[in-house]
Amino acid sequence: MFAKFRALYTSGDFIGAEKCILPVLDSKNKVPENYIAAAFNNLGVIKMRLGLYTEALGYFDKAENHTTNVKKNLKDLAFIYNNKSRIYTFRRSYSTAIEFLEKAIRIYQSLEIHDSSILHSLSTAYLNLGIIYYEMRDYSSALENLEKSARLKLNNSLPETELTFLNLAKTYAQTDSLNKAEQYFTRSLNTINKKFGGDYYRLAEVYFDYGLFLRSERRNAEALEAHSKALSICLKDYGEKHTFVALSWKHLGDDYLAQADYATALEYYQRSLIAVVNDFSNNDIYSNPSVDSSLFDIRLLDNLKSKARALELFANEQNDKALKLKTINKSLETIELALHLIDNIRNNYLTEDSRIYLSENEKETYLFAVHIASTLYSLTGDIAVKTKIYSIVQKAKSAVLRNEITENDLLYSAAIRDTTREKQNRLSGNIAAYNNLIIEESRKTSPDSTRISLWKDALFDMNREKEKITEEINREFPEYYELLQKIEPVALAGIQKHLRRDETIVDYLLSNQYNEGKRDLYILVITKDDFEFRETILDSLFSKNAGMIRNSFQHPAVNNFVEFTGPLAYIYGSLLKPVRELIAGSKLIIIPDEEIAWLPFDALLVNKPGPDQADYEGLQYLLYDYSISYCYFSSLIFNKSLLKQEGEEVLSFAPDYGLPGDHGLVADSLLGTVNELKSVYRWFRGKSFTGESATETNFRLAMQEPAIFHLAMHSISDSVNSRYSYLLFDTLNDTLEDGRLYNYEISLSKLKSPMVVLSACNSGTGTLYHGEGLMSLARGFILAGASSVIMTSWEVNDEISADIISGFYYYLSTGKHKNDALRLAKLRYLKGSSPAYSNPYYWAAYEVLGNSAPVKRNYVASGLIICALFLIAGVVLILYLRRRRIFSERLL
């Protein structure tokens, strides 16, 4: 029966193959578990080939459940994992796909390697791994795995060499090895034609990619011919409604778009939409389907993006104003459907890595949407369209952080059981910890592959357990998933309602890709009563100057006055001067994007120094004009769950690094810390943990308190993945923790703090992701629930840090907003410093991230003090009047 199934499946008769396998499951006789597992796995393969990926994954899950994890079944289990990885690859959830494949490879390598079926499965796993790395644009890793697959197949006379040849061809094409690419495409085509004939279903896959290669070589007629052949095969094998048919129509549309035949391209894109969406058959290019009934969301997303761009180009050709307006409107509607689909896809991803990958790779989609909305606004002047620009920009930025904050709020709600939440957090922490172990071991000169494999196996099991917990939460608390689906940034009116009249939000959206040497920049300016935006173009000089500024702050020893101040003035001219007249009041809230996140705005120069000036004294920094704070996205500024945080008590932690601890490091003691803490408690009450008491264990206990946290300590940054950056505590008397509080551990915590001060620890640096911003320790505390974080963007001088922090707490104690307090502290420092120390390197590192509202004082205590003073004054007055009366009576 299984042999018959294999023959039918190989021939492309998927309906016949399905009918062949169903009797195994319908049998009333007792069927062995391995037969049931094989039947479910084969049904999954059929559904995957038919483009029904959700059904396929369900069958693979059932196959796994019927396959016990014993040695005789390991081969079957690995085969199921291989198939599951393909589903996750189609969905572009690459980190999960890689995990399944690596698990399968480890299983194959543990078995009898001379078995031809195992060798074939191993070669397929390497092939699939190569495909994933190709999709991730990691072409060197793709070639490494594809060549492993090819060697196994050729050396052992294994089947399906044509698929490996195809993917080698694609990868060589991307690495400019065009002759090799052509050779492998030809080998793949010839192998399939020879073995199966010219209408074999897998031949379409080769024609897809060969056509793309031909088009990139400007061989347009040949590309059109290849894609037409692919369409013919797909229609024959799959019918009108199928993801591969949709892909065929899209490729043909792309071919006509490349030839500037926009009308024909749109016809093909419309047919592609019809093929990928159930219950949609409208050939009118001005009609769009519902995104809720697609066969495959990723395919629909690509189609909508292509159609929207073609509509814009088509509109540019039209002389009829009404038709032009209609076409631009439809382009905007189409790209908005794509954005809605991106949200749906993101919410269905299981891992943060997959969500970040989506954000990075779809950022240009959001930029195109803003561009189309801007074009429409210029044609109509419609205020509703201008407001839509704001909404699109908000969705384009920090979507992963926004989702995570909402998830945390929901997880800590009363509806989720404490045990379930604790189990999920524990698993998340263990997963991150094991990932860190693997990273650290891999960085060694001679990494232990056995230990790495052991940890990866443990990771695999933990991730599957976490998935089950997520399913349990969704099942027991359906509102959880529904609420996540409804996450929307705060509307413009809601932001303006909370803004004060002296506050202005300046929000940047910057393209991460160059287009003919240019990058698009959108600047949104939001005040209490108005909203405006500006569209501008940046060239390579912007990145060059931003890089020079960052380098000057990171390496002050090579700080050249002209090479430093020139970029500070240039960046001001690029980012703030174009919108200066739109700013209201003296408080700026900056929402950066891309490398703008590295720039300290209060150090930007309003005017370039004169040719004779050689020192920093008297320069016109933006600090003199504005109090500046920063945020990841505008909704976060007034996030209700963060605004309600209260706590005036300051809990400070200052380790003594004079002796080596269990962490194996000897760090210099932080000079000036004692004076810094004295200044804090001059204005605020609280408790100080210094030296041996500044342990990770004590901090974890203190995190449960509604207090301000002041952390005067070192941080160790991981330049590759900031999730593994950590704060360094004292370990001398800590028997429970290792003294390293990792960023991922902070993110999984729950804080009730109005402010976390990360003093002298380079806490604002991290990994920069397109669309998400900086992944830093500061971000970890925001995710944990802190209303605001006072952070540093580079290493700071301890004594100057103590001076600025002292001033900050003083002004904060008088009721000043955090951004005002920090500005006044910096101005006080500049006023009292020598010209040699007025360089921004010394004072500009500190920044306010998040809500800058004043810290709430203990009004009950203050009230009692005032009442006591009045009481004392009253007693003194009574005594004075009584003595005066007695004295008067004596005179009488």
Name the predicted role of every residue range:
Residues 2-10, 35-49, 75-90, 117-135, ...:
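Conserved alpha-helical positions within TPR/SEL1-like repeat arrays
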Residues 9, 21, 25-28, 47, ...:
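Eukaryotic all-alpha helical interaction scaffolds
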Residues 17, 23-24, 56, 62-63, ...:
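Tetratricopeptide repeat
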Residues 159, 179, 183-190, 194-198, ...:
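Alpha-helical solenoid repeat scaffolds used for protein-protein interaction
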Residues 389-391, 399, 717, 724-726, ...:
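Caspase-like cysteine protease fold
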Residues 408, 485-488, 529-534, 545-552, ...:
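Catalytic-core domains of enzymes
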Residues 632-634, 639, 707-803, 876:
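Catalytic cores of nucleophile-dependent amide-cleaving enzymes
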